[in-house]
Curated annotation (Swiss-Prot):
SUPFAM superfamilies (UniProt xref): DHH phosphoesterases
Family membership noted in the UniProt record: Belongs to the PPase class C family.
Presence of keyword Membrane: no
Protein name: Putative exopolyphosphatase
Cellular component GO terms, alphabetical: cytoplasm; cytosol; mitochondrial matrix; nucleus
PANTHER family: BNIP - RELATED, EG:152A3.5 PROTEIN (FBGN0003116_PN PROTEIN)
């Protein structure tokens, strides 16, 4: 089955289920595949590659990947739309979060496979918590779902690397097939997977890059056309990802956002690919938008991780906004515990310290590295 047809079939099955939810007493057997709630290139590509390859093994089930964001938020990710188009995928054939949350409750007993996360943080999906059947991830192991098969959690530049390594025999068999549409599907899967792997590893040049990433990229490159140029592909995708044209600061916060609920504290952690000077110059109402965002999200604490390049040097900054006393307690504990580790240096404080901006000298510490420090800070608050 062509990749596009596979996705279209899953979307049709979900649509039919939604239209007939009140009249149909039974439903087909589903398997769901979901990335994390940031819905970045890695999560979305991983979910599609995993789902298509899983379908080759689970012929009796309908395997449905879904993007863990509302459909309307796809517009905030031009790099994702661009990559989908390169892989001959129509966004109309993608299932989104707002499709899933409307499903009858009985559907959530079907198995779900997690990629690019190893627990379900989004409350909208908590009905799936007893149904986690498999995990492939490259974040810190949270220790749950020990029964999952596979349960692959290891450090790597991109989750898509681990997904492709696991399913490489399937992808290779598709490419070697004499059926032209299967051969083409292998090429489309390879292009789709190469996007996040190259973006997350800086074209295999940054500190996140592992030997596994390099090997899988070499394998995948053998499935793409000979005139495909890796550097050009990476540069175009990077430019799409960096583009902020037409986006408000609120849009930028939602573009790569994760929510955490440690000890009942609501933390929103956004990653924005711009520095503080750019934000102050280009998004004049950013402080009001940040506070409004925190209000709408009912956040106790908002963390904004900024990344910037200056004179070809990569750097990071942090913005902390403490909306509530509980958020302030967590932020203060986090700063006390992590200030030295992250190399945090204050730039500016406002609103009696509720809004603070920091340079982060430890530029290797992305959100993936900062979140475990944040969780350790929760334990400090709880023990007081």
């Amino acid at each position: 089955m062509k990749l596009g047809r596979f996705l279209e079939n899953g979307r049709e099955q979900i649509r039919n289920l939604l239209l007939n939810a009140s009249t149909v007493s039974s439903a087909p057997s589903f398997s769901f595949v979901s990335g994390n709630e940031s819905a970045d290139l890695d999560s979305c590509a991983s979910s599609i590659v995993y789902a298509y390859c899983l379908q080759r093994k689970q012929l009796g089930r309908i395997v449905v990947p879904f993007f863990n964001i509302p459909r309307k938020e796809l517009r905030l990710r031009p790099e994702l739309s661009y990559l989908l188009n390169l892989a001959s995928i129509s966004s109309d054939d993608i299932v989104f979060l707002d499709d899933i949350v409307k499903l009858p409750k009985r559907i959530f007993s079907n198995p779900i496979y997690l990629v690019d996360h190893n627990s379900l943080d989004r409350k909208d999906l908590e009905n799936f918590n007893g149904s986690i059947a498999g995990i492939i991830d490259h974040h810190k192991d949270e220790g749950g779902s020990l029964h999952a098969d596979p349960r692959i959690i290891e450090e790597c530049g991109s989750c898509c690397t681990l997904v492709c390594r696991y399913f490489m025999p399937v992808i290779r068999s598709l490419y070697d097939s004499k059926v032209s549409e299967l051969h083409q599907t292998a090429t489309n899967l390879a292009v789709l997977a190469l996007g996040p792997i190259l973006i997350d590893t800086g074209n295999l040049k940054n500190e996140k890059t592992t030997d596994t990433d390099v090997k899988i990229v070499n394998d995948l490159c053998s499935f793409v056309p000979k005139d495909w140029v890796r550097d050009e592909f990476f540069d175009t995708l990077k430019e799409k990802k960096k583009s902020c044209k037409g986006f408000s600061f609120d849009d930028l916060l939602r573009r790569d956002l994760k929510q955490y609920f440690p000890d009942g504290i609501v933390v929103n952690y956004a990653s924005v690919g711009k520095g503080l000077d750019w934000i102050k110059k280009k998004r004049l109402g950013w402080e009001d938008e940040l506070k409004s965002f925190a209000e709408v999200q009912n956040s106790d604490l908002v963390i904004v991780g900024l990344s910037l390049s200056k004179n070809d040097e990569f750097g990071r900054q942090l913005i902390l906004y403490k909306r509530t006393e509980r958020g302030a307690g967590l932020a203060d504990s986090f700063l006390k515990l992590s200030k030295q580790n992250l190399g945090l240096e204050i730039i500016e404080e406002k609103d009696n310290g509720d809004l603070s901006m920091w340079n982060q000298r430890n530029s290797a510490a992305s959100r993936k590295k900062v979140v475990p420090l944040l969780m350790d800070s929760v334990k400090q608050v709880a023990s007081k």
